[in-house]
Amino acid sequence: LEHLDPFRIPAFEQVLFAHAAPGTVILTTPNREYNVKYPALKTGALRHGDHRFEWTRQEFADWAAHVCRSYGYQVVCSGIGEEDPQVGAPTQMGVFTKCV
């Protein structure tokens, strides 16, 4: 997701969830909250030059809930990597399952 310009996300949603409409979709994206754990990363900077944005856990969960409401999916969000009690895991994942 983070490699897309934010204005392209609605089109991405349409293509993936409405037109292709696979039974299962697995998406991962950085957890912006975790960036404080990278001492060399300046405040507000993105982890990679090709990232267009990075979402907090709440922002990702809100977007995932929107996708589910709009396209008939259920989602389970979780972290990937060692989880910090305050900022969560470095990467977040959503496993979307098409409702039947």
How should these model regions be labeled?
Residues 4-100:
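S-adenosyl-L-methionine-dependent methyltransferase catalytic module, highlighting the catalytic core
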Residues 1:
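Conserved P-loop NTPase "ATPase switch" module shared by AAA+ and STAND
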